[in-house]
Design a protein with these regions (language model features):
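Hydrophobic structural segments
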Residues: 1-95
Length: 95
């Protein structure tokens, strides 16, 4: 069974992100608990309007090049089931 986690990761990997030297599909993921409250007008994948939800969620970290970041984020947004998925991008400098 393919989970949303794997669907989203594979969409990002398809952009070329997650490649390091002679390795592909490189990622770090940790399980945690997310919380949110859908407001009127939202189209929540899970949860009820005006009710606080707490759900198990994975935080996934994937490396990509500066040239890949825009397309990788677009792939994440398209594949993710949430209306507004959370993400962050950090520049990593080589030493």
């Amino acid at each position: 069974m393919t989970t949303h986690l794997e669907i989203v990761k594979n969409a990002i990997f398809a952009t070329g992100a997650g490649s390091v030297d002679h390795y592909q599909h490189c990622a770090w993921q940790t399980l945690g608990e997310g919380q949110f409250m859908p407001l009127p007008g939202s189209h929540a994948f899970i949860g009820e309007i005006n009710q606080l939800e707490r759900v198990p969620e994975y935080k996934v970290e994937i490396i990509c090049t500066e040239e890949q970041i825009t397309v990788a984020v677009a792939a994440l947004k398209k594949a993710h089931p949430y209306e507004s998925p959370s993400y962050q991008a950090f520049r990593v400098e080589s030493i």
